[in-house]
Amino acid sequence: MKNVMPLEDCLSAAAECDAPMVSICGGEPLIYPQIEALVQGLREQRRIVYICTNAMFMRRKMREYLAVEYKKRPAEIEPLLGTLLDERLVTPSEAEQVKKGPKDASKPVISPSKWMYWNVHLDGLEKIHDIIVEREGVFQECILAIRMAKILGYQVATNTTVYRETDMKEIETLLLYLANLGVDGHTVTPGYDYDAAKTDMAKRLGIDPSAFFLTRRNTIEKFSQAKSWGKRFRLLGTPVYWEFLTGDRDLTCSAWAIPTRNIMGWKAPCYFLTDGKGHYPSYAEMLADVDWDSYGVVDGVAKDPRCENCMTHCGYEPTAALGLKGKPGDTWKNILFNFGARPNPKGKVVLSEVFNGVSAAAKPEKNPELVRE
């Protein structure tokens, strides 16, 4: 890994824009050499932290946490290890390694906190998700990591992207299954055909991007099938943004409100597009220099043709949250969303429908601990 942001730059960027919530993205952030120190530093700044991950290294990071805690309070951790062994979430050799304590006692670990979320990427049930990520077994590892995280008291969210061929009934089944596992919230967002994604798809996979990504019309058609989800599932998007996705209202883009900082600087104008100077040395300079009125869709007209099909949360969710295109009743909707009773969906999930890919032959329906009525 040659191109990584120094830890000090990461922490100073968070302080510079003073965002209440920081999403650590990648690539895969868990291979960042100082990920534990970064999470610790952001928490010391009193920020909510989301670690966006494919979950391949989650269980390893949680075992490192257990090793530290076992040294401090073995009597409390021993029963947890027993549960993890019974659930086959750690192996006997991994449990013994935990009992030996941390390899480096000075190294911080990622501990459970109500202000930190594992944000696990899941784009469908087993078969579809493994196809999208081009690797068998990834879905299964995601579920194992989620189960382990909930046993240990972590907050867990999931992030799902909807594409042209996505079956919304499948996503509904996924959300119900994840609710049964105790997942704390879900982000569901439309797949947008930004330039880098289109180039990668055509070059690496030989796929026509227009057959994969959503137009604005496609997005509304897809999400209109899911109007009830906001009341049924613990969605992390505001009700106003969900109404936008379902075609029941219009919003404008506020890309400046969820800025992206990478190794080159503050990316402008947004997570998807890079224009003008491309990257700025400071957040303030980016805010002042970018002509924000040149982007987004206003009254059905795209200010920039590349924005025509974008309805993603990083541009439009802040508009909804900040009330920038507000209507009577929006404030009350957001108050209820933030402080009202949260949905608690229950229902039996047929595990053969969930594990419908590489693990189908394992007959997961014989594992009743995965389901609660």
How does the language model describe each region?
Residues 1-115, 323:
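Conserved alpha-helical substructure of the radical SAM core
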Residues 7-8, 250-251, 260-261, 298-302:
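A general structural signal for short secondary-structure junctions and capping/turn motifs
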Residues 35-38, 138, 306:
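Hydrophobic side chains within well-formed alpha-helices
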Residues 48, 75-258, 262-264, 268, ...:
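Radical SAM enzyme [4Fe-4S]-AdoMet core and its adjacent flexible, acidic
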Residues 267-373:
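Flexible mid-to-C-terminal extensions adjoining Fe-S/redox cofactors in radical SAM and related proteins
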